[in-house]
Amino acid sequence: MELLQVLKRGLQQVSGHGGLRGYLRVLFRANDVRVGTLVGEDKYGNKYYEDNKQFFGRHRWVIYTTEMNGKNTFWDVDGSMVPPEWHRWLHCMTDDPPTVKPPTARKFIWTNHKFNLSGTPQQYVPYSTTRKKIQEWVPPSTPYK
């Protein structure tokens, strides 16, 4: 009897993602295969799911889009791809998703969501105003013989 329940749950996993191809796609991209109810989709194409049978902290998740702001994100998924309005719901700061209760507009939130630029040439590097404790040695300049 328990074997039948495991097989039934496995078939639900495969059929819930659109067949074997969709199942493998989600498995390789997210390293986790879960089935839940679709709560909503943001303007970039990220899909947000919820399953209250899971324990707290793993009952809400996102399936990221394959392209965002002109960048191919199929294998390059980043947590900064979640817009602020969905971040509130995803991290359980609110029970109402933005599809039910839209958040209030804030002037510090961008209209077009940006990626995390850390580790790229566009990253923010603050100017250092303190003097170095150790200075680099500069060899005396002599002509090469």
From Swiss-Prot:
Pfam families: NDUFA12. The keyword Iron does not apply. GO terms for cellular component: mitochondrial inner membrane; mitochondrion; respiratory chain complex I. It is found in: Mitochondrion inner membrane. The modification N-acetylmethionine is found at residue 1. It is a peripheral membrane protein. Belongs to the complex I NDUFA12 subunit family. PANTHER family: NADH DEHYDROGENASE [UBIQUINONE] 1 ALPHA SUBCOMPLEX SUBUNIT 12, NADH-UBIQUINONE OXIDOREDUCTASE SUBUNIT B17.2. This is NADH dehydrogenase [ubiquinone] 1 alpha subcomplex subunit 12. It comes from Bos taurus (Bovine).
